[in-house]
Amino acid sequence: MSEIWEDAIKSNAWPFVEAKKILDSLNGKTPEKGYLLFETGYGPSGLPHIGTFGENARIVMVQKAFEQLSDIPTKLICFSDDMDGLRKVPSNIPHPEMVAGYMDMPLTSIPDPFGECESYGHYMNAKLRSFLDKFGFKYEFYSSTNCYKAGMFDEMLIRVLEQYDKIMELMLPTFREERKATYSPFMPVCLKTGKVLQVPIEKWDAKVGTVTYKDEAGNYIEVPVTGGHCKLQWKPDFGMRWAALKVDYEMYGKDHLANARLYSEICRILGGKPPVQLCYELFLDENGEKISKSKGNSISVDDWLKYAPVESMALFMYQNPTRAKRLFFDVIPKNVDEYITFNQKYHLEEDRAKRFANPVYHIHHGNVPKIETFGITYVLLLNLTSVCNPSDKTVLWGFISKYEPKATPNTSPYLDHLAEFAIRYYNDFIKAHKSYLAPSEKHNVILRDILDMLSDISDQTEAEGIQKAIYDIGMRAGYENLRDYFKDLYQILLGQSEGPRLGTFIKLYGVQETKKLVAGKLTMLSRKK
């Protein structure tokens, strides 16, 4: 075994932990199909969203971790449930009244309300593929409609008929009495209307491969379960798909957890081996409520990318996937700065085991770009933006260049992008909510001390020296908790309750500019009198 393998197999980073579970499940054997299959699922009734990005980003992290542990080839498929019948018309599509006329029709049988593709399902699938391609995911796309109609699932559908009683024994206890009376794992596709029917099955015949149901007129209709003439209910469909495609690894949201046992058991009943599974927690809004597209309390991928680099979003997805996390705009700056910190630590670290434990290793699949921000963080740029209210990033670069002459938009493109992001974020989320604290007599003494201190130093003074001087002034000011001291300074100078290390901020903003800022607050106090 190589040293790289030894470090990877011992790693506690969750993608490696998941990869080890997969390796253990194989018992040292390559799957008969010759490769390891990872699967993600997509419900194409709506557009791809940040959860779609999260699931695909996470599963690829596990896939790449597995490739460090084994030379077994891997493949990722993205499976679209586009044969599902339409149950609800999304609120954010054109011509909803037209789409409403196709309730219960397979998504690939509904005209495209956007007028671009052959069906609504095809449009959403195209959006998914474009979305995944944009972020560089390597995958094979599978359409439920194509799989059913092309006969890819035929063998398993006959097996569902053969194991009909066992599957019903498993499923029926999970329903209320009235649903028990009508439930069947098969949903015939009506030859007349094209609708996916949820009707009782009167008769099933595994030898000829058919089911029989009553239509609205009371006529008995016999249809084959193969060739796309029937669709399985979603819970049996999940387990059947695992068995048919021989899926080795799948992750899903907590909303699937209660049914995961059913998926696995149906897979076993059909002669398959359930995949290794990871259940990830769902996102919450800033109030701790479950995010819902219909409520509009979520962040879209485009929203995030308006204010921050994609790596920060990938870091958010990497962190603690099995723990519920709040997803709202306030988390963006924190994740940007954490990404910068992890990136810098990665490139300073020579210990490979510690590199494997660093999130950026998994975000970039081992090929971690080196970024240089010269100690300037996203939050620091937001605070700089707060005091100089720039119309464009050239104003920020004026301060950055004085702080670090080596930094230019060309030599530091990452920092250049952060400057753009910071201005957008400030204008949209901070500017309207700034609330300045009017300085009191006590604050007046503090501000004069700070002004005197700034008069005794130059732009060459190091940030740590400035920080210590600010700290010493606070110690003399009589605060029981210095956190309150810094909070007061942030509210007086920046109009917000939190802020950066003031030594670094003053170094970036400039001593003379900071003197003007402080003097302006003293002028406010004089006017108040």
Curated annotation (Swiss-Prot):
Places the protein is found: Cytoplasm
Short motif ('KMSKS' region): ranges: 290-294
GO cellular component: cytoplasm
EC number: 6.1.1.6
Mitochondrion recorded as keyword: no
Top-level EC class as recorded in UniProt: ligase
Reaction catalyzed: tRNA(Lys) + L-lysine + ATP = L-lysyl-tRNA(Lys) + AMP + diphosphate
Motif ('HIGH' region): 44-52
Keywords (A to Z) from UniProt: Aminoacyl-tRNA synthetase, ATP-binding, Cytoplasm, Ligase, Nucleotide-binding, Protein biosynthesis
Single GO term (MF): ATP binding
Residues binding ATP: K293
Superkingdom of origin organism: Bacteria
Matching SUPFAM superfamilies: An anticodon-binding domain of class I aminoacyl-tRNA synthetases, Nucleotidylyl transferase
Main location: cytoplasm
Biological process terms in GO annotation: lysyl-tRNA aminoacylation
InterPro entries according to UniProt: aa-tRNA-synth_I_codon-bd_sub2, aa-tRNA-synth_I_CS, aa_tRNA-synth_I_cd-bd_sf, Lys-tRNA-ligase, Rossmann-like_a/b/a_fold
Membership in a protein family: Belongs to the class-I aminoacyl-tRNA synthetase family.
PANTHER family: LYSINE--TRNA LIGASE (PTHR37940:SF1)
HAMAP family per the UniProt record, alphabetical: Lys_tRNA_synth_class1 (MF_00177)
Annotated protein name in UniProt: Lysine--tRNA ligase
Lineage, broadest ranks: Bacteria, Pseudomonadati, Pseudomonadota, Alphaproteobacteria, Rickettsiales
Name of the encoding gene: lysS
